């Protein structure tokens, strides 16, 4: 019942491989690389709780969709198989109480601003906001309209701005990766 040919058994799989570079995805993570080096040298890992929390938080960001206009189509595209945002540890959630990141995509009107703030207040700490597209960043095409908020940063604090009209799915993924780097850099206890 055992393995008859041990040459056919894969002993050391590379894990998730980045298709662009053909390098395992975990090799880009400095914390993970340091932990595996310590584990290989000593047999155990020493770290601070803050570093461990930051590492786990960056790999499990749950984003809530707040799609207001055409940018929401590009936001949905990041979850599709071509870009697959979940390979970076980011997954969509429908409830603000279960999400860490809110992506504001599209034109924010004065009537929608209180609802945006209410949803933001329902998110647990630490919470992050990505402003996606020209309309969410500064009003965009409708900047001079009486009914448009000239940037969602007037309502909620924004961590990452993704420019474009509409920004591509690659730009949003770059913004998500920039947010992950920001979380690693600033920490959760210091925020």
From Swiss-Prot:
GO cellular component, one term: respiratory chain complex I
GO biological process: aerobic respiration; electron transport coupled proton transport
EC number of this enzyme: 7.1.1.-
InterPro entries in alphabetical order: NADH_UbQ_OxRdtase-like_20kDa, NADH_UQ_OxRdtase_20Kd_su
Places the protein is found: Cell inner membrane
Membrane topology: Peripheral membrane protein
Cofactor: [4Fe-4S] cluster
Any one Gene Ontology molecular-function term assigned to this protein's record: NADH:ubiquinone reductase (non-electrogenic) activity
Cofactor remark: Binds 1 [4Fe-4S] cluster.
Alphabetic keyword roster: 4Fe-4S, Cell inner membrane, Cell membrane, Iron, Iron-sulfur, Membrane, Metal-binding, NAD, Quinone, Translocase, Transport, Ubiquinone
Record field: catalytic activity: a quinone + NADH + 5 H(+)(in) = a quinol + NAD(+) + 4 H(+)(out)
Residues reported to bind [4Fe-4S] cluster: 70-71, 135, 165
Entry keyword annotation includes Nucleotidyltransferase: no
NCBIfam families tied to this protein: nuoB_fam (TIGR01957), PRK06411.1 (NF005012)
Similarity-based family: Belongs to the complex I 20 kDa subunit family.
HAMAP family for the chain: NDH1_NuoB (MF_01356)
Assembly and binders: NDH-1 is composed of 14 different subunits. Subunits NuoB, C, D, E, F, and G constitute the peripheral sector of the complex.
Function according to Swiss-Prot or TrEMBL: NDH-1 shuttles electrons from NADH, via FMN and iron-sulfur (Fe-S) centers, to quinones in the respiratory chain. The immediate electron acceptor for the enzyme in this species is believed to be ubiquinone. Couples the redox reaction to proton translocation (for every two electrons transferred, four hydrogen ions are translocated across the cytoplasmic membrane), and thus conserves the redox energy in a proton gradient.
Protein name in UniProt: NADH-quinone oxidoreductase subunit B
Species name: Parvibaculum lavamentivorans (strain DS-1 / DSM 13023 / NCIMB 13966)
Lineage: Bacteria, Pseudomonadati, Pseudomonadota, Alphaproteobacteria, Hyphomicrobiales
């Amino acid at each position: 019942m055992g393995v008859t040919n041990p040459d056919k058994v894969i002993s050391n799989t590379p894990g998730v491989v980045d298709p662009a570079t053909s390098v395992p995805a975990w090799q880009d993570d400095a914390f993970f690389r340091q932990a595996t080096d310590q584990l290989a040298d000593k047999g155990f890992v020493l770290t601070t709780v803050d570093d461990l929390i930051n590492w786990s938080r960056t790999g499990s960001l749950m984003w809530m969709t707040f799609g207001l206009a055409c940018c929401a189509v590009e936001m949905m595209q990041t979850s599709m198989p071509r870009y697959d945002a979940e390979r970076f540890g980011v997954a969509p959630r429908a409830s603000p109480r279960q999400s860490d990141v809110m992506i504001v995509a599209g034109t924010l009107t004065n009537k929608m601003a209180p609802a945006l703030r209410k949803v933001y207040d329902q998110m647990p700490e630490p919470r992050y906001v990505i402003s996606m597209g020209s309309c969410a960043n500064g009003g965009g095409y409708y900047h001079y309209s009486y009914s448009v908020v000239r940037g969602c940063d007037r309502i909620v604090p924004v961590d990452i701005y993704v420019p474009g009209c509409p920004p591509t799915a690659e730009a949003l993924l770059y913004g998500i990766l920039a947010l992950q780097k920001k979380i690693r850099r600033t920490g959760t206890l210091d925020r």
